[in-house]
Amino acid sequence: MQNDKIKMIKMKIYFVLLIFLMFSCSTEQTIERTPKLLKIGGLIKNSDEEISGMDWYNDNLILLPENLNGYVFAIKKSELDSRINGNDTTTIFPKQIKFNTPNYSELVPGFDSFEAIAFRGYEVYLTIEIRFADSMSCLLARGHIDEKTLEITVPEQNLTVIDVPTYVDNMSYESLVIDEDRVIALFETNGDSLIESPYALSINSSGNDIIKYPL
């Protein structure tokens, strides 16, 4: 039974990677596509915001700045659709949403930045990069989102340490995928020049059960 579950999770990880490759590599190699640039205005245009992660919560695209600044951004799907598939050429102004977290810069030694964000219902999961002069680590934080205001709250105690597979400066777990009741964490790089045996981490919702799955 356990082996069947492991195989199923592996298949889902491979499927996610396959979908990513399908969308990042066009099958029509001879046709050149022109990117459609969208106009974005407001605070998010400031390069210091450094958007590091994003995920959909219902019909809202939530964008996570890497800095500890107390807010995230949200763009409605309808706003994106009207500009990508319609004739709307006006500027999108992402809405600032409260992001309530502890002061990790004081609470967590080596706190560097927020990296990834993912939603499972009203639950929200984030990775926090921990950076020292000669080592790296990562924390998985768990919180919740208000379905009406979109305000995100992360309690101080909901942290799980997830060790990096190897030391590469400024590299940590920067992608999260939800798989039913588990969170799949992917390291920033998985090439064999840096990691001999790359793997994904499957973490349960409470953060007390972590399983490695080879990639």
Mark where each language-model region is.
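Sequence/structural signature of beta-propeller domains
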Residues: 27-215
